[in-house]
Amino acid sequence: MPRGHKSKLRTCEKRQETNGQPQGLTGPQATAEKQEESHSSSSSSRACLGDCRRSSDASIPQESQGVSPTGSPDAVVSYSKSDVAANGQDEKSPSTSRDASVPQESQGASPTGSPDAGVSGSKYDVAANGQDEKSPSTSHDVSVPQESQGASPTGSPDAGVSGSKYDVAAEGEDEESVSASQKAIIFKRLSKDAVKKKACTLAQFLQKKFEKKESILKADMLKCVRREYKPYFPQILNRTSQHLVVAFGVELKEMDSSGESYTLVSKLGLPSEGILSGDNALPKSGLLMSLLVVIFMNGNCATEEEVWEFLGLLGIYDGILHSIYGDARKIITEDLVQDKYVVYRQVCNSDPPCYEFLWGPRAYAETTKMRVLRVLADSSNTSPGLYPHLYEDALIDEVERALRLRA
């Protein structure tokens, strides 16, 4: 209460005491007089207090006052009762807390400065503390998001338990799916490895058949790959054919529509009575194909260094015996030179002497540059048109051959 209002109240009380108190009375009369005076004083003070309150309400806005809106002890009592009622509602509602409902100014000293107001505030604090202890989902950290707290987002233990059960079930399903996928991958890998091994075995079997000039039958090939791999026979046969093309320059073809008998045909179109008829025929055919390709790629003339660099990409090295070709140097510098498929000569004015390879007359007669280009394109899964310079050279070679035949 402002000082001006207090002074007016005190002035009214003193005036009533001065006007209504007779002097010189003692004993029971004085006591009775005092009771009447106190009764009249209290009624007068209440009337005066009402006047002061009305004047203060008219002159001073409630927002600027630091006291209770009513400014009277009754108002303080009513304020404390409303707090207790609000506290009861807080206990029933677990979603509120004392920090969210009580302003900081109401904690501590009473707005009116009276002991009753202070007691009412302390009672509210005690009730609020009890409510906080009873409510498991509310605390003074109401502003903290649930994600930052360790509790479940729903605020109940059952929700956390159900979530953990779901996670365990999901993990079990994931493990089962992962194990199933791993088994499928392993089975597929084993199948590929088995097909690859059986293809190599079948290629060696066909090589021996060809060298012995024996007929190649499907029944014999099925016996070679065994009965348990019969479902994979088409894949094994396809991989075997690819292996024969890369290694020996020949492809596996059916002799009739029944598909029961096969034969090996040169990929370069070389006649069977030529290089494929002598000893060590397939290794020679394979190295000849690689040698003609590298010569054509290097402008129809390749140095010995360029040839060995290309053969090194195929795992064929100078001075090292190969598991399929044996002595590769002897084949390309002696055997194929004697058969006139390649020319091996010293580079002019080279010191120390260097050597180069060219196509021989028999290679020009039995194959064409276009066939060699197609072999190169097939090995890289492309088309001859992707090598424009080589393709142009091959077309010119085709035209010249046609003109020679007409002449």
From Swiss-Prot:
UniProt-annotated stretches for the region Disordered: 1-175
Pfam families (alphabetical): MAGE, MAGE_N
Tissues expressing the protein: Expressed in testis. Not expressed in other normal tissues, but is expressed in tumors of different histological origins.
SMART domains on file: MAGE (SM01373), MAGE_N (SM01392)
One cellular-component annotation, GO: nucleus
Keyword terms: Tumor antigen
Record GO biological process: negative regulation of transcription by RNA polymerase II
Signal peptide residues on this chain, from the entry's feature table: none
Domain MAGE per the UniProt entry, residue ranges: 195-394
Feature: compositional bias, Polar residues: 18-29, 57-71, 94-113, 136-155
Protein name: Melanoma-associated antigen B6
